[in-house]
Amino acid sequence: MDKNRISAMLDGVDRYPFHMPGHKRNTALLGNEFPYDRDITEISGSDNLHDMSGVILEECNRASRLWGAVGAHILVNGSTCGILAAIRALAGHDRAVVVARNAHKSVYNGIELCRLRPTYLYPKMDAESGICGSITPGQVDAALSDAPDAKLVIVTSPTYEGVISDIAGIAAVAHARGASLLVDAAHGAHLGIGQMQAHPVTFGADIAICSLHKTLPAPTQTALALVGKTCPNSAAFAAQLAVFQTSSPSYILMEQSARCIHLLEQRGAELMAAWTERICAFEREVAHLTHLRLCFRGELPACAWAYDVGKLVISTRGTRLTGHALAELLRDEYKIEVEMAAGDYIIAMTSLADTDQGFSRLARALCEIDARTEADAERQGCFFPQLHAVDAPWQAADLPHLTVPTAQADGCVAAEYVWAYPPGIPLVVPGELVTGELLAALAQMQKSGTELHSTSGAMPQTLRVLED
């Protein structure tokens, strides 16, 4: 494979470094386990991530062409920095924002920083799996009608579980009402390559943020911001990236991002086709599961507009297994570690770097576990209630609060976030009313094996709530 421009530049660095970083590329002292020889700073012949004019700009232009965007930015602080920058550039301050309630916690951090008033979009839930479905254009239109001062709509597509929303329809509605569309596509970097579904940026997203490291062969923390042709202020977005992204970006991460882009440019269609075939072979191998179930295959539930087949969501509903128990069996007996376990399902994330052997190993394990699993129609599935927002998150964070036993928080207004990680989607947001139904759901999640976290770090024992 031909080298990308960043790799070629790093190969040519042969000057003694009287500059940062402090390791001075001294592999004789430090060893070769880490690529110190490629860890440079902004020296002559390199480039500046926040004022691109050379090799970094060339690789970003490659990414723009590959995904069909009008602009691209390599991100070394993960998708989080791109989301924060996009919110600050597009949403304004002290006004409404329309946001899917199943957004990542980085979105809520951006809402707090910009003192925005969220109008939430609640996706319908698939009754069989307990998984959130798509956001619809009709929901967005109604929300913008209720919040006419909103300048930004934020949706997640694909979701952590792989559910895709009608981005073209949502973009049309948002733009007709004078709002921009930010798509958190952190789990969709592979979309738009080969025969995979088109990427949100080609469907009308003004900015789409995708994590290269989640579904493509790139190291943790690498991500990409793709700018659409309708973005109202790409210069403001670039300026905000300089605020939320490090001023000392790692050339190691940027090089690996460029290598990933280069690989997709040269072999993307071939690799995506092979990946798709492996998924199809896996589906055939698990087609006769009796108790466990591979979700979102065949006819999709009404609540899902489309689905990313690269996500393998295996449901344990109707069995004596929880998702956590299934994950533990796979880990302990089959040496397979899945991405996430919830009360009623597991998520196995796949990518073009998976092998035939890896897929077959998972399929055999699931078939063996399924054969010895018993049905249990009595076991209740985990459903999460829709909550009522009394205050905006930033308002609740600024108000006097106290700490109470979680079981006694019914009727109080939350003053902190509660979430399960992964995926980092808040179950409770500051300013939301705590109900008995919510407390029962949290208790059920904990009983099933889900670890709950909170801003104070005291969940599940106590919860911060607003004073009366």
Q: Language-model features: where?
A:
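Electropositive phosphate-/nucleotide-binding environments in soluble metabolic enzymes
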Residues: 50-57, 80, 134-138, 161-164, ...
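Short glycine-rich or small-residue beta-strand-to-loop segments that form or flank ligand, phosphate
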Residues: 46, 73-75, 153-156, 313, ...
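Conserved PLP-enzyme active-site core in the AAT-like
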Residues: 5-8, 29-30, 66-69, 79-298
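Charge-dense polyanion-binding interfaces
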Residues: 451-468
